[in-house]
Design a protein with these regions (language model features):
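Non-heme Fe(II)-dependent double-stranded beta-helix
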Residues: 2-22, 30-128
């Protein structure tokens, strides 16, 4: 008969951390991911954005009124690396107000499967 997996004897989060999470809705775990890994993820995200042709679509991501603003690009993005702009990224003529690197709200959704840098990071045992 296989033995049961070991149980943690101490909580993963302290009482103060749980309280902060309940109060704020998020928790910052300082030092959980080494700075060098964060730098690599930021650099790769920048490379992906630079390589993205902003003329191919103008999909805006917002959590407000998402049902109305969800488009086919968003709905078809589950198996791709897709880019979504900030609300207000475009002027009345449809031109970006600032460089695309400063206009992206979200990169989604499959970079953890399709990009080797995000894949390596996302599959670390510490994140499970």
């Amino acid at each position: 008969m296989p033995s049961a997996p070991p149980r943690l004897t101490t909580p993963v989060l302290s009482a103060a951390q749980r309280e902060r999470f309940e109060r704020d809705g998020y928790l910052v775990l300082e030092g959980f991911v080494p700075g060098v890994e964060c730098d690599a993820l930021r650099a790769r995200a920048h490379e992906l954005v630079v390589g993205f042709d902003a003329e191919t679509h103008r999909s805006v991501f917002t959590t407000d009124d998402q049902t109305r603003k969800t488009d086919d690009y968003f709905l078809d993005s589950g198996d791709k690396i897709s880019f979504f702009f900030e609300e207000g990224a475009f002027d009345a003529r449809g031109q970006l107000r600032q460089p695309k690197e400063r206009s992206i709200n979200k990169i989604g959704h499959a970079q953890h499967d399709l990009d080797p840098v995000f894949d390596r990071f996302s599959r670390q045992p510490a994140l499970a």
